[in-house]
Amino acid sequence: MTGDWMSKITHSGLKSWIEEVIALVSPKDVRLCDGSEAEYQQLCQQMQEAGVMTLLNPELHPNCFLVRSSPDDVARVEQFTFICTKTKEEAGPTNNWRDPQEMRAELHELFQGCMQGRTLYIVPFCMGPLHSPFSLVGIEITDSPYVVCSMKIMTRMGASVLEMLGSSGTFYKCLHSVGKPLAPGEKDVAWPCNPGHMRIVHFQDDSSVMSFGSGYGGNALLGKKCVALRLASYLGHKQGWLAEHMLVIGVTNPEGRKKYFAAAFPSACGKTNLAMLMPKLPGWKVECIGDDIAWIRPGDDGRLYAVNPEFGFFGVAIGTSEKTNPNALATCHSDSIFTNVALTSDGDVWWEGKTATPPQGMIDWKGRNWTPGGEPAAHPNARFTAPLDHCPSLDPQWDSPQGVPLEAIIFGGRRTETIPLVYESLSWEHGVMMGAGMSSTTTAAIAGELGKLRHDPFAMLPFCGYNMAAYFEHWLSFAGKGLQLPRIFSVNWFRKDENGQFIWPGFSENLRVLEWIFRRTDGEDSIARRTPIGYLPTEEGLNTTGLNLSRDALQSLLAVDTQGWRAEVNNIREYCSIFGSDMPRQILEELSRIENELK
């Protein structure tokens, strides 16, 4: 097997990099992945035999598997995620920076011999539609068959990508290891990892990623957050486009007119639910381009076009149910991998929120018999990895090489007070300030940070690959290019009343907010009123027919809380101070304008 890959790779730069890596990590075997279904099944079979994967009941979930990770490798690890640029200033105050030379030396030591006793897999992948001029090719070298199978679902992967790369194409070097070499005769564990030495490192000078010690999704599937956001955002800054942590949907009204919207929410704030929304209002349709990442570029006609670079969903399982997201359950019905969920006695999967009553006789995510009233059966960051084309509401343009034209950009977060249900920016600059000022209650997708309110500008705090002040400036620069820019909105489904209950019903009823946004992009002025914080819906402008929502509740959702907003402005201004003199003045001017108008 070791020599087979040589004849199939015509790219001399790729060949020499692979040889370098093999010499460094000393694998027992080398395998070039072709992305075929036969290869996927063989690797899944191999993982079943090793006790890594459990085949689910094929009558309930055809061709689906359950994987349990180590309890200390369950989420992205921001404290061990580094951006290596020439200077610390280029990475900015929100990123962990290390000197590239020092970090390379440290990683060289960690990777030395780290694949002993393991197979090295070469995984060619493409972020974006094959043969789109905007797509990026990466090669991930990994010692994890779980990563190989997940990359087959999450990216366009295999022989077709090598063919596309040819003998001289540009590619991103992505090196990953679980960091647990095996001595001769040593028995492997089900989920090898090395929590004491985790490193997820991005080198912007040569567009490469090195990840060590973790097998978890965001740390190990290097095409996702690493290439498609952290490296791509840096590239976009240089080339005049945006790589964003955004869902993209097509919304069609009862007259048959369709518009595309992009929306940025922090992890576990409902991106996947909105991306797969099933409207209750008659005649409306919502279709999904993607639920997590959007690459946005100016088109020849002056509009901004969005592409989803991914090929699958890596969705949060907790809370996903027939009520909250039936399309997600349909998407992961077959050909999917579930990680850290519970296993039922009949070979099905379960997680908190899937049904009102937990089934009897389950095995929890740690592999133990589960008893009600104890620890959760599924980990809070349990995931499903499912193919994009299994989504029942997939948009026909999902694979378009040019992308889809955006008419609205939406920012949202999990805020229990102050922030209204929906409002629209007064200008592009004001909209950029709205994105820069985003904050949200944190979730289980980030290790060790559950339940705190934190600033998360554009939902990109963990994913922006350069100085965020320069990133804000980059967003602002689109106003000076003569483009037909989308309108910008803010939404907040998570307002609570004095009893701690959510005021807005959410989920499929969020279509009512999308309807207001749709009508605003049509230029309907009568449905909005201008306030210091932006255009808010009039009470009659928001369609609440058939909702059990009192007038008082509606008014509180659409009110400008003067005191709360003064505190919000101060809070955003204080946060902006970490960027010092790099902070764009337009954002500070917008904050001052709001403050003055609130008086």
Swiss-Prot record:
Residues at which Mn(2+) binds: 225, 245, 292
Listed cofactors: Mn(2+)
EC number: 4.1.1.32
Keyword Disulfide bond assigned: no
Cofactor notes: Binds 1 Mn(2+) ion per subunit.
Annotated residues for binding of GTP: 268-273, 383, 414, 507-510
GO biological process, one term: response to starvation
Enzyme class: lyase
Swiss-Prot/TrEMBL keywords: Cytoplasm, Decarboxylase, Gluconeogenesis, GTP-binding, Lyase, Manganese, Metal-binding, Nucleotide-binding
Compartments where located: Cytoplasm
Pfam families associated with the record: PEPCK_GTP, PEPCK_N
Catalysis performed (reactions): oxaloacetate + GTP = phosphoenolpyruvate + GDP + CO2
Superkingdom of this protein's organism: Bacteria
GO molecular-function terms, A-Z: GTP binding; manganese ion binding; phosphoenolpyruvate carboxykinase (GTP) activity
Family annotation (PROSITE patterns): PEPCK_GTP
Family: Belongs to the phosphoenolpyruvate carboxykinase [GTP] family.
Subunit: Monomer.
Protein's UniProt name: Phosphoenolpyruvate carboxykinase [GTP]
Organism: Chlamydia muridarum (strain MoPn / Nigg)
Designated gene of the protein: pckG
